[in-house]
Amino acid sequence: MKICKCFKKQKKNIKSLNLYHHYKFPPPLEPDYKIRKYDKKIFKCKLCGHFTASHKINVNEFYKKNYSVISHGEKMKIKFNKILNLKSKSDNYHRIKRFLKYFKKFKKKNLSLLDVGSGLSIFIFGLRKIVKWKLIGVEPDINFVKFAKTLKLKVIHSNLKSGILKNQKFNIISLNKIIEHVKDPVKLLKISNKYLLNDGHIYIEVPDGKRASKDLNGHLREEFFVDHLHVFTQKSLKSCIELSGFKIINLKSIKEKSGKYTLFAFAKKLKLNEN
């Protein structure tokens, strides 16, 4: 019996998940991850609509070295510049815009931000031009880390679970399209919580499965590609965040300039007496 892992507290209330789609072949636009036997099922939770992938493909191998090359190509600088040149037509432009709108009262303060899974580092690169904050990234793919170095950005080659940050604490942690890639999103958010200062905030983006699934041939969309172990709904994202010790300030569904359906959320770390 498949159980929606985002709802551990409600396990006893879930009898089963509905099969959303059984993939015998990768979607046409999915990057070629050189998977020999492609067999993947996606289940949909009856309670929250959350989508969970079930397969034996070792997606952890994607992020060690080859994910950056397969998903972005060998010429990262070209991809990076292409996104920059899109300006207001890029998803990142609007991400930074809503991010700074939320944190506008802190814009001139000396804050610290940890960006988890920095990828091309375009988010913290854009922020560096506007704010004077301490910006640090953490990224498991060595190719992305090397590229960040060419941009003179501090991106650590590791992941949040490794403990490499030791006793460091941050005002803000951002996870842009990250928690859908891990087996246990709640666990990752709880780890993130530990790296936040007591009045800290978290910013999260995830694919919106509810809206994507309503499109014609929605199961073939990017939101359901093999590297996404979870695809969220507003209800499931809300639960994941609240189970991790945060109070949601803002949670919305948007259609980005790229055509992606995305959920974003701003949340604040709960104080000990609020848990």
Please report, for each region that a protein language model flagged, where it lies by residue.
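Short N-terminal helix/helix-N-cap motif within the alpha/beta-hydrolase-1
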Residues: K183-K187, K214
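Short, glycine-/aromatic-enriched active-site segment of Class I SAM-dependent methyltransferases
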Residues: Y20-P28, I204-H230, K235-C240
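A short glycine-rich, Lys/Arg-flanked "PGG" loop and its adjoining helix->strand segment in the class I
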Residues: V186-H201
